[in-house]
Amino acid sequence: MKIILLGPPGAGKGTQAKFISEEYSIPHISTGDIFRKNISDKTPLGIEAKEYLDKGQLVPDEVTINIVKDRLSEDDCESGFLLDGFPRTVYQAEALDSFLNANDNKIDMVLLIDVPRELIFDRMTGRRICPSCGASYHVKFNPPKLKDKCDICNNDIIQRKDDTESTVKDRLDVYEKQTEPLINYYKKQGVISTIEGSGEINQVFQRAKSALGAVCK
């Protein structure tokens, strides 16, 4: 089964991707993970990607397509995969379709996680992280016991650059402008299914399983 997850930043795609990957025994392929590794290793790709990500912008198509193709060519993708973070533009989607078609494959379902913009904004701007131990918090949904202090190591928790109000607004604007046309692209192919992304994590997962059941019979 070959699946794509779509949805705005902060919609919980990464969390649902892990659940789906485990449920259906397919690899979870996150372009975010690929970029983070390159950024950590300070590769040319990582340096270039970081410049865009720090501004809340999407990484250009040409930087991402070949690395995704290489990943999809690995043995563990023969029985299927779940793409999280790719494609983000119609151009990327067309490149993916061409690659899959050349190998007699196709996308089985595009799962769109739909969350209101206002909720996304609250989710993202409220996130905090401990720079020392990596523990994560949320000022509204998962606050630390002591304000601005990590429960684990007692160091100050911080807001990442990606989670500031201005950056979140920019990221959502970029998503709406560049990514949402994918919805129409996949609607024309008849492979898109939309689920409500609000509520408890397990509730969203049950909705995802119900939608995916149509291609798992």
UniProtKB/Swiss-Prot annotation:
Pathway: Purine metabolism; AMP biosynthesis via salvage pathway; AMP from ADP: step 1/1. One of its GO terms (cellular component) is cytoplasm. One of its GO terms (biological process) is AMP salvage. Residues 126-163 are annotated as: LID. Residues 30-59 are annotated as: NMP. GO terms for molecular function: adenylate kinase activity; ATP binding; zinc ion binding. It catalyses: AMP + ATP = 2 ADP. Zn(2+) binds at C130, C133, C150, C153. ATP binds at G10, A11, G12, K13, G14, T15, R127, S136, Y137, G199. AMP binds at T31, R36, Q57, L58, V59, G85, F86, P87, R88, Q92, R160, R171. Its EC number is 2.7.4.3. Its main location: cytoplasm. Belongs to the adenylate kinase family. NCBIfam families: adk, PRK00279.1-1, PRK00279.1-2, PRK00279.1-3, PRK14527.1. Catalyzes the reversible transfer of the terminal phosphate group between ATP and AMP. Plays an important role in cellular energy homeostasis and in adenine nucleotide metabolism. Monomer. This is Adenylate kinase. The lineage of its organism: Bacteria, Bacillati, Bacillota, Clostridia, Eubacteriales.
